[in-house]
Each structure stands twice: as C-alpha cells, then as structure tokens.
Amino acid sequence: MTGKKRSASSSRWLQEHFSDKYVQQAQKKGLRSRAWFKLDEIQQSDKLFKPGMTVVDLGAAPGGWSQYVVTQIGGKGRIIACDLLPMDPIVGVDFLQGDFRDELVMKALLERVGDSKVQVVMSDMAPNMSGTPAVDIPRAMYLVELALDMCRDVLAPGGSFVVKVFQGEGFDEYLREIRSLFTKVKVRKPDSSRARSREVYIVATGRK
C-alpha cells in the first residue's frame, strides 16, 4: 500500500471517528471511550452486573468498560483490570499493566483475584490490526481463547462472560466451545458498534 493510500484511509477513519455520534456523546459525558455505550446496551438487554459483584476486565484501557461497571456494582463491588497499555486510575478498580499473554502477568492477575468469587469476566481485547484478515483473525482468536481460559480458572458457577470476537475463521468453533460451558449464549451487535466492523459480542450466562 502506498503512503498516499494509507494517508487517505487514515483521513477517512479520523473523519468517521470524530463525526461518530457515540464518540461525540462520550466526549460530552466525560467518558473514556465509546465502548461505554456498547456495554450499556449489553447491560440493558442481559443484566449482567449487580451491586457488590467482583468483575475481571481484560483489555481494559483506556477504561470505558471499567468506568461503566463501577456505576453498576457500587462501592462494595470490585474490578480487577488488566491491559498492555497504561490506564489512568479509577476508584474501585485494581489495575495491572502487562501483557495478558505473558504467564507471569497471568499469574499476577490470578493472585489479585485471590479467593474472590468472580461473577463476570469481560474482555474487550483486540490485537493491533494489520488490515489483513488472514493475520488479524488468528491473533484475535488467540486472545479470546485466553479470556475463556480465565473464565475456567476464576469464574464462579452461574457467572457470566462477555467477550468481543471478530467474525471469521474459528468463530463458529469458539461459539460451540462457549456453549459447552454456559447455559445461555447470545451473540450481540450493539448499535454503538460500527456497522462495517467484524466485531460482535458473545454474551454467555450461567457458567456450568
């Protein structure tokens, strides 16, 4: 791809981004990202979060999902969050910066969870996209498999899992895997998710 094509594509993305009504609303409300609205839509339909819950947030930065969940679980709730990128502090959120794919980071995250009964694991993780689906989709699927492994390790019986997945090779198999672990599984495409994006959200409840 030439520099001119990249520049044109980047300009289109920026124009679309800043004219996006959810981006504008997020800025007006002082929210960290438009992802806040995606989780709000999911909460309205699936009622995942309740006061006092313990929640694990994977791929947390810049903090849109954690910021939303704090409003739902209240002061007695707890969020353990992790991301490769830094994240400004949020009251009620225990943040660990590190690469979730690293075993030492995974171990540190599990230590922070400790004996807590985790009611929700949520993952908005995504790899750095190259624009080539044959490269991007396997990278993304690896991350969502790791998120599901976290569910196996820490999620309490009856707990819930919400994960961003990019449709493509491996999606159907992953969905079957989740259905074997949860009693109810839905695939959501929030209105606040860009229409041309491959992303969908799998919402799984009732950990077996």
From Swiss-Prot:
Disulfide bonds: none
Recorded family membership: Belongs to the class I-like SAM-binding methyltransferase superfamily. RNA methyltransferase RlmE family.
Function: Specifically methylates the uridine in position 2552 of 23S rRNA at the 2'-O position of the ribose in the fully assembled 50S ribosomal subunit.
Reaction(s) catalysed by this chain's protein: uridine(2552) in 23S rRNA + S-adenosyl-L-methionine = 2'-O-methyluridine(2552) in 23S rRNA + S-adenosyl-L-homocysteine + H(+)
Gene for this chain: rlmE
MF-aspect GO terms: rRNA (uridine-2'-O-)-methyltransferase activity
GO cellular component: cytoplasm
NCBIfam families from the UniProt entry: PRK11188.1, rrmJ
Enzyme Commission no: 2.1.1.166
Pfam families linked: FtsJ
Annotated CDD domains: AdoMet_MTases
Positions of S-adenosyl-L-methionine binding: 63, 65, 83, 99, 124
Name of the protein this chain belongs to: Ribosomal RNA large subunit methyltransferase E
Location(s) in or outside the cell: Cytoplasm
Protein keywords: Cytoplasm, Methyltransferase, rRNA processing, S-adenosyl-L-methionine, Transferase
Active site residues according to the UniProt entry: 164 (proton acceptor)
SUPFAM superfamilies in alphabetical order: S-adenosyl-L-methionine-dependent methyltransferases
Class in the EC hierarchy, top level: transferase
